[in-house]
Amino acid sequence: MARVIGDLARPNCPGGPAVIGISEVENERVVRDLVNTSPAKEMNLKYVHYDSPDRRGIDVALIYNPRLFRYTKSSTHPLIIPDNPNFKTRDQLLVEGTMAGEHVCILVNHWPSPYGGAKSSPLREAAAALSKHIADSVRTANPSAKVIIMGDLNDDPKDASVAKVLGATRHKKDTPADGYFNATWGLYDKGIGTLCYQDSWCLYDQQILSANLLGKPANGLSYWKTEVFNREYLVTPDGKKKGYPFRAFNGNIWQNGYSDHFPIITYYVKQLK
């Protein structure tokens, strides 16, 4: 996995990614070992991690390059379901800092599982409502703050949690000034996904941006493009799952892969004065 981090965003960004949101994190030691393994180690990365109440014992975390993202503060936000007080899942992680001289707030997510189909949708809709509340609160407190919502949302861009509750738009032109744009919806429209289930691609891994990231580079930090990172070594080379993400386990068999999800990369640009 350290190899993936070392390769992400290159060659467009020779210094590598500024921030990386990760999920399915067992504990802090896993993140610490990851950033201290070559080639990630040579990037001198830092991280933010908190334990979550999730019953599986998994968390989210943010890895960042302190040369590109100057960390300021962080907080975690639990998902509480009033009608189901015993439900436990991953907290949402808010990390604030400075990137390219601007105030940027990053919300890392891993929304509840899609297992159960429509019956589990209300849980992800509740997670979406929490994400929107956090993002809106940040922007109310500081209207110039640029907000990035990222993570494994366990829903596609068109699903109600993302498109209706969070209100993430399909097209830039349809994004209101106080709204959010789904930078991954265009990929989904092209049939591109980050995970494959029964030969059908899903795009659960998404990045959603506040509208003030949609301006011109001459006026500040701005969105450029999003892509799925699916280098050859991340793809299953043969067998029934050929073309799928090359996961670590195939059933109970260790196959020395990486993940059942491909990462996504979103690029931001700013014109130098």
Regions found by a protein language model. Give the residues of each.
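N-terminal, active-site-proximal structural segment of metallo-dependent hydrolase catalytic domains
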Residues: 1-42, 46-60, 237-246, 250-252, ...
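Alpha-helical scaffolding within the catalytic cores
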Residues: 3-4, 89-93, 192
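Active-site beta-strand/loop signature of hydrolases that rely on acidic residues for catalysis
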Residues: 4-32, 63, 106, 131-163, ...
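Second-shell loop/turn segments in exported
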Residues: 16-22, 49-50, 81-83, 114-124, ...
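Structured beta-strand-rich core segments of catalytic domains in phosphoester-bond hydrolases
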Residues: 19, 25-103, 109-112
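Extracytoplasmic/secreted cell-surface and envelope-processing proteins
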Residues: 29-32, 56-59, 115-118, 156-161, ...
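Metal-dependent phosphoester-hydrolase catalytic domains
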Residues: 87, 137-147, 155-273
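Metal-dependent phosphoester/phosphodiester hydrolase catalytic core
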Residues: 99-129, 133
